[in-house]
Amino acid sequence: MEPISSRRDFLRMTAIAAAGLPLARPLIPSIAHRVTPTTVGQERKLGFALVGLGNLSTHQLAPALQKTKYCRLAGIVTGTPIKAATWKDRYGIPDRSIYSYDTMERMADNRDIDVVHIVTPNALHARDTIKAARAGKHVLCEKPMEVSTEKCQQMIDEVKKAGRQLAIGYRCRFEPHHLAMLRVAKEKESGDVRLIEAAYGFAIGDPTQWRLNRALAGGGPLMDVGIYAVQFAEMLAEQYPVAVTGMTPIKSDPVKFKDVEESMTFELKFANGISASCTTTYKVNGLDRATAYAERGSFGLTPAFDYYGIKGWRSDGKPLDAPQVDQFATEMDNFAECIINNRPTSVAGEMGLRDVRTMMALYESARTGRTVALA
C-alpha cells in the first residue's frame, strides 16, 4: 500500500470544511476565468447538470438544488428518453441542456453548465467524470469515488489536466451535527477520544439492482454505506487509518448476495492511538449510529448518517444540538462557493482515492484473515 498523506495536510483540509476559510492565495489559478466574483452571489448561480436520473437525483438532488443559494439545475444526462421528457417539463430544462451518455462531450459548448454531478453506478464514475472534465466542467462525484484506485487516479488526473475541481459527495462533512461532533473532539471537552464506533446499514430490496452487482458496485454495503463509517472515523481521528481489519459474516441469503458481501464488521487503527470499530450491512434496517468514547465520557449521533433527523447526545447531559439542514443543498453550495472564490474543496478526489484504498484493504483483510497495513 502507498503511504498516506501527512496529518498536517489532513487537518488543513478538515479545517477548510469546518470553517469555509479562503486560503491566502489561489491554489488553482486556471479555474478563475469562468466565475470570479470577490463575494459569493455577485454573479449568476452556477449551473449544475445531473448525470443519472435515478432515485437519488429524483428525490434528493433535484429538490435540493431548488433550495441552494449558489446553484441551479441547468442540465441533465440520461439514457432514458421518457425521463428526459419528464424532467424537461418539471424543471424547464431546455433541449440544448439535455444529453445522453454518448453526447456528454457536447457540454463543452454549453456555458449554462458549470458543474457536472455524477450520480451513476460506482463503476461508471470514471467514465462520466472524464467526459465532464474534457468538456471543461467541474465535477462533483457521488461516493464511493470509483471501484479501484487506478480509476480514481485517472479521474484526478483528467480533472487536474482540465484545470477544474473534483469533489466527492461526502455530505456529512458539512452536516452541522457532524461538525459539532468534530468541535467537541477537537476541543477535548470530554478529554482525548480513544475509541470510535460507527454503524450504518439497511435491508436492501430488489435483488436485481446494480448495488448487488460487483462489476457495477465494486462491493456491497461497505462501498455503499459503510463508507460513511470510514469517513466519520477519519473525521474525528483527524487522520487516515494506518491499518485495517475486516470480517464478512456468513451470508443469510447466499443467492441474493452471491456477488457481494451481505455485511461487514471492521476495525480501523490510527497512528495517534485511536481505533474505530464499525459495522455495515444490507441485512437489517435501523442500523444508524456513531459514538466517540473519550477519557471523561462519550458523545454521539443517533441517527447519525440519514438524510434527515440527525440527533446528537452527550453522556454528561450537555446538549449536542445543531440546525437541521438539507444536507445535499449544503454540500452543493459549499462546492459552488469553492469554485466561485477559487478555493480548493475540502473533499477533493485525493480523499476519495484514499477511502477507496482503505476499502480495498478491508476486502483484502476479510479475504485473507489478516490485518492490512496502509502505511
Which residue stretches match the model-derived regions?
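Predominantly a Rossmann-like dinucleotide-binding segment in NAD(P)-dependent oxidoreductases
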Residues: 56-57, 165, 172-257, 369
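Short acidic-hydrophobic, aromatic-tinged amphipathic segments that line or gate anion-handling sites
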Residues: 97-102
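NAD(P)-dinucleotide binding in Rossmann-like oxidoreductases
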Residues: 250, 254-261, 269-332, 348
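C-terminal helical cap and adjacent loop that interface with cofactors, partners, or active-site loops
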Residues: 13-17, 318-375
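N-terminal secretory signal peptides and thylakoid transit peptides that target proteins
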Residues: 1-18
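Beta-strand-loop-alpha-helix segment that lines the small-molecule cofactor/substrate pocket
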Residues: 114-115, 121-122, 126-173, 188
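N-terminal Rossmann-like dinucleotide-binding module
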Residues: 14-92
